[in-house]
Regions:
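A structural signal for small-residue-enriched, beta-sheet-centric alpha/beta enzyme cores
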Residues: 1, 6, 12-17, 24-144
């Protein structure tokens, strides 16, 4: 799921992309958040907490030992670790992080729904049959 946003605040135009990769394994979910927004490590820690909000919006509850993993990284400051010279880095304004948080939640929610709808009926170990979600019923649920 890729989301392109343009955020306006105090006449400051900030454009960034967020790409969400979802891996659902049994009852566990792994969410990888990739962005080109120039966010620093302490800001990425805050961004990496946001997929839990998307899970909650979809009705999931956290269990002890649920094993959900959320990881975030940014490509916004490429070359910042060049050891041959001094470098300047950009930092996404803290008062504008809400747009990154909102994009992360929305993109995660949509990626989860897309993953659920894309699943197909399958037969697993010991003949256990798991049915795909009926796409038309899922569409109806989200249209209301």
């Amino acid at each position: 799921m890729q989301l392109h946003l343009c955020f306006w605040r105090f006449f400051l135009v900030i454009q960034f992309q967020i790409t969400i990769y979802i891996y659902i394994i049994n009852i566990y979910i792994i969410v990888i958040i990739a962005t080109n927004a120039p966010v620093l490590p302490h800001q990425l820690k805050r961004v990496a907490k946001r997929p839990a909000l998307a899970l909650g919006r979809l009705g999931a509850i956290s269990n002890p030992g649920s094993g959900d993993i959320f990881v975030a990284f940014s490509t916004g400051n490429r070359g910042a670790t060049d050891e041959d010279r001094f470098n300047s880095i950009e930092q996404f304004p803290n008062n504008a992080l809400e747009s990154v948080f909102r994009a992360t939640v929305q993109a995660t929610e949509e990626a989860i729904v897309n993953a659920m709808v894309a699943a197909e009926t399958m037969i697993g170990a010991d003949g256990l049959r798991v049915h795909a979600l009926p796409r038309d019923q899922v569409r109806d649920l989200f249209s209301h």
